[in-house]
Amino acid sequence: IGFELVQRTGNFWIALPLAMILGALFSALVEILLIRTLIKHSTTGPVAGIVPIIATLGLLGFIRATIGFIWGNQDIQIQPPLSKVGFKIGEDTIALSPMNLLVLLTVIGMVLVLGFIFQKTSLGLSLRASAYAPEIAQLAGIRVGAIRTIGWAIAGAAGAAAGLLQTVNGTGVVSPDSLEFSLLLTFGFIAAVIGGLESLPGAVLGAVVL
């Protein structure tokens, strides 16, 4: 999606927010059409908790196959909007580049915004309650289904931004079978496990450690 938007708009700065919006809409549809249906039919049993995980992994395979069918399996290039050459301090060039700085500031900004939403707003309270104790949340009057959809939309927007920024910050090359695509998924999951699957700051700390 990010590649297509960059190609059509010719402007990375326009493509980035559009990718986030489309990522949010796509994730919301996945939750409504797939995850919600699975949860309704698999609320009990030893594998109930991992059914959504298995489903999303299957969906990932379908998406990768679809990408290959539409755009082919050849590598496609996305040009970075900023220089990837490190800043110069005197005669020395440091490892931090303008592109690195953009990614760093974006991550910090997103963590602060999401942290505020989760900790300081009624929406955040509803999101946490729906995740930890959906039955109790529903008894308290929270529309768990709608809140879960909002949570997926937020995750989709953040994921779209992360994918597009990491692509241009890395090799700039993306394809369904690219190593960078696989590493992004693998390291993202490992970072979440290291930092705690229920902790946003912990997940960021896990990513920094990696």
Residues covered by each model-derived region:
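Transmembrane helix-bundle core of multi-pass membrane transporters
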Residues: 38-41, 47-120, 147, 171
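Helix-loop interface residues and adjacent transmembrane-helix termini in multi-pass membrane transporters
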Residues: 8-10, 120, 146, 196-197
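Short loop-to-helix capping motifs
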Residues: 11, 132-134, 199
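Hydrophobic core segments of alpha-helical transmembrane domains in multi-pass membrane transport
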Residues: 3, 20-26, 57-66, 106-115, ...
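Alpha-helical transmembrane segments within multi-pass membrane transporters and channels
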Residues: 10-59, 66, 205-210
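Inter-helical junctions in multi-pass inner-membrane proteins, predominant
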Residues: 117-119, 151-192
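Membrane-helix/interface signature in polytopic inner-membrane proteins
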Residues: 113-152, 181
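Hydrophobic alpha-helical transmembrane segments of polytopic membrane proteins
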Residues: 23, 186-210
